[in-house]
Amino acid sequence: TDGVGTKSEIARETGRLDSIGRDLVAMCVDDLVCAGAAPLFFLDYLAVGRLDPDAAESLVAGIADGCAEAGCALIGGEMAEHPGVMAADQFDLVGFAVGAVERDALLDGTAAVAGDVLVGIESPNLRSNGFSLARRLAFDVAGRSLDDPAWEGASTTLADEMLAPSVIYAPAVVAALAAHEIHAVAHVTGGGLPGNLPRVMDNTLDAVVDRSTWEVPRFFCELQNMGDVSDDEMERVFNMGLGMVLAVPVHDADAVVATLASHDRPARVIGELTVGSGQVRMDGTRQGDA
């Protein structure tokens, strides 16, 4: 079960509701694959201040598109009007996904071992996390508007970058799980890499991540520069260009990367697990505009 957080406010303010449903599906099904489960079906809950049939249609169409890409069935949902509690154009969207995994294939955080390498899968945008900070930086600190260019000379606006749809990783990760030995899968959501990698390893391991192994998308760098935010805070709020991380035996890393690439999900080795105490260490110098 998950939602899309305050990204929905950007969608409401712009009236661009067509992709927010896809974001919802991504947040739910990509959590499922962290347990090794393949998504089976999906339900949604939509609360509105006042029902707008066109808006509801756009939201549900986005959910249906996301489910089709994720390979799960949209089997139902619930819609509720909350007049007097929510503003007429406000909405809240929640999703619920169910998947299946054989008991002996369940990923529970105990399989990862020292020497495993970390394979990061690229995320070109914010996905659905960090929007409270992103909104504060762009609107309150920098005084920008949604129609402004995302950066000087950009062909996209702030709204375009903030509403860019989340990548759905589930089909590619399910394929990799079926073909290779994978010890852990982490969904990089709120908390970033430092907050999510500890969920998939025990406290006898450390995750050592090399920042120089991938390029941070420019919009993250633009947000950071708007408010002079520290690297540590950026990495604890945003995905910084990596939406999922897999822990795999070193001998299988290249094959896993190739399988993910064959499903149009570019990935690369970004670090390793070492003997430790449950910490995440961010080493190296970041690629991307600082």
Language-model features and meaning:
Residues G36-A38, L133, E181, P266:
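Short loop/turn motifs at secondary-structure junctions
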